[in-house]
């Protein structure tokens, strides 16, 4: 009887680990598939013009991510920087929502929803979703900030509700992701001034897989 109970316990333990290994493998397959889909967007459309800036979409987002890493940011901010304008790539052929020649209207919200669908946590998605809001906030609070924006960024502001009301500013300041959203805006703006060589896409492919697998394990 004792032997039977011990054997049963061993079997249950084995079945438990087998089950969890199966779930882990399925999760990893889905993560890799999602990340490869994202990387394919960069490979296919990343070489397109970055709305009047002197760099491509891929160069802009990668330089923003590299700058965040140089400043010692955690992976959530680094990846937010790398992914922040992916909305322009997702809807690149959708002429109905273009801001003239200045990219895709509400690209930040398109990116936010897409990344949640691809398994990213809501924090990183909402940091990205806030980066246009952060520009509007800074233009309103610090009028001199607008002077330092690139010409293309000043033009897109006209499509993005321009300045904020006091109520909007107060609401944004109370957002738990407020500071991280401003950080992303800084890297977004500053990367437009850079011309350095960029890291390969595989670097960010691996970083995304690592980030998503850790997020899944912590659920």
From Swiss-Prot:
SUPFAM superfamilies according to UniProt: HD-domain/PDEase-like
Transmembrane stretches, start-end: none
GO molecular function: hydrolase activity
Residue ranges of every copy of the HD domain listed in the record: 57-158
Disulfide bonds: none
Domain of life: Viruses
Keyword Hydrolase: yes
Keyword Cytoplasm listed: no
UniProt entry keywords in alphabetical sequence: Hydrolase
Coiled-coil segments: none
Protein name: Uncharacterized protein L432
Species of origin: Acanthamoeba polyphaga mimivirus (APMV)
């Amino acid at each position: 009887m004792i032997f039977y109970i011990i054997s049963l316990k061993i079997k249950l333990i084995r079945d438990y680990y087998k089950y969890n290994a199966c779930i882990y493998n399925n999760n990893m397959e889905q993560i890799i598939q999602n990340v490869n889909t994202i990387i394919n967007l960069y490979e296919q459309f990343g070489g397109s013009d970055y709305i009047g800036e002197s760099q491509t979409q891929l160069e802009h987002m990668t330089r923003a991510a590299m700058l965040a890493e140089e400043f010692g940011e955690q992976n959530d901010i680094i990846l937010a920087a790398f992914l922040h304008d992916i909305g322009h790539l997702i809807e690149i052929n959708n002429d109905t929502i273009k801001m003239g020649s200045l990219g895709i209207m509400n690209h930040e919200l398109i990116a936010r929803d897409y990344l949640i669908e691809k398994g990213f946590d809501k924090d990183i998605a909402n940091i990205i979703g806030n980066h246009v809001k952060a520009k509007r906030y800074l233009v309103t609070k610090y009028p001199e900030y607008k002077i330092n924006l690139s010409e293309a960024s000043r033009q897109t502001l006209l499509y993005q509700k321009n300045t904020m009301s006091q109520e909007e500013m107060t609401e944004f300041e109370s957002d738990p992701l407020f500071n991280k959203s401003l950080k992303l805006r800084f890297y977004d703006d500053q990367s437009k001034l850079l011309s350095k060589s960029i890291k390969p896409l595989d670097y960010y492919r691996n970083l995304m897989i690592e980030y998503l697998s850790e997020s899944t394990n912590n659920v």
